[in-house]
Regions:
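P-loop NTP-binding module
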Residues: 2-42, 52-283
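Short, charged amphipathic recognition helices of the HTH superfamily
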Residues: 45-46
Length: 283
């Protein structure tokens, strides 16, 4: 499996804002000429001139700048879920916290030389934000330029395919059952360096599939093509899947939600992970 050349093509770095807006269908060449004339006559920046003429919005300019600097985020017209706040509102306070978490994980866990590229996102119960954190962490890692893969290993209640609006026809379950291949890894078109492997069809035996040697082999293969691999998991207090995944990933990040998570459940899951020889990276 070698998705690198197909999934990691950066094309807008160094291009002018006008060219990006034309390619995106936000400007016609004739409108761009009007903007350039005003820019030259008034000594204005291209974006300011375009907005003054009413030809584009401030959001259009921000979008073009994000592509110019290889820091992509999505417009409100995108088909992906608005739960991906890191993709829609990359400068909001909640995303600043996600970037701070990203920095801590880069310092404390992810290390290519030590072959630490994979991290399971775990929590004891449903509704604690595992899928939200996994998805948005994947976005902010990709915005850093890290080749990022998000695997939906919650084969009980998969969500990532709906968040990213990707096909769930082939995914992790088919791959572990020997019926899937590289096509199960899907690029997220508008986000550089981000790919998703959805859960696939809900199988009758998720725990058995995850316990097979093929899962470890799959992670090893994917680690050759990605810098960061994040794995969404089922509720740890309900199923043993999370512990199995965390051991295969070697490390786990515990998610807790204020006024929802119970300390006793968090401590119990943490103890189970450590006993199973998984490293608890943080919470």
């Amino acid at each position: 499996m070698n998705p690198s050349s197909e999934f990691h093509d950066k094309g807008d770095s160094g291009r002018s804002i006008g060219a990006i807006l034309i390619d995106n269908g936000r400007l016609s060449p004739e409108a761009a000429e009007r903007i350039l004339k005003l820019q030259k006559d008034k000594g204005m920046r291209f974006g300011d001139a375009a907005i003054q003429l009413g030809l584009v919005s401030a959001a259009d300019i921000e979008q073009a700048l994000s592509h110019q600097y290889d820091y992509p985020y999505l417009s409100s017209s995108s088909q992906v879920s608005d739960r991906l706040v890191a993709a829609f509102k990359p400068f909001s306070p909640v995303v600043e916290q996600l970037r701070a978490l990203r920095s801590q994980l880069m310092l404390r866990w992810f290390d290519a030389e030590a072959e630490r590229k994979t991290l399971a996102i775990v929590s004891p119960e449903r509704g604690e934000g595992r899928s939200f954190i996994a998805a948005n962490l994947a976005v902010v890692f990709s915005q850093l330029g890290e080749r990022t893969l998000l695997i939906d290993a919650d084969m009980r209640n998969p969500r990532q395919h709906t968040l990213f609006s990707v096909s769930n026809r082939l995914g992790l379950s088919e791959t572990l059952a020997g019926r899937g291949g590289p096509e199960a890894v899907q690029r997220v078109p508008a986000l550089l360096d981000l790919c998703v492997m959805p859960a696939g069809a809900v199988p009758p035996n998720p725990q058995e599939l995850l316990s097979r040697p093929m899962f470890s082999q799959l992670l090893g293969q994917l680690a050759k093509d990605f810098d960061v691999i994040l794995i969404d998991t089922p509720a740890g207090a309900e199923y043993a899947d999370a512990q199995t995944i965390a051991v295969r990933a070697s490390g786990a990040l515990m998610v807790a939600r204020k006024n929802v998570s119970r300390a006793s459940r968090l401590h119990r899951l943490a103890d189970e992970l450590v006993t199973a020889s998984a490293t608890l990276v943080g919470s």
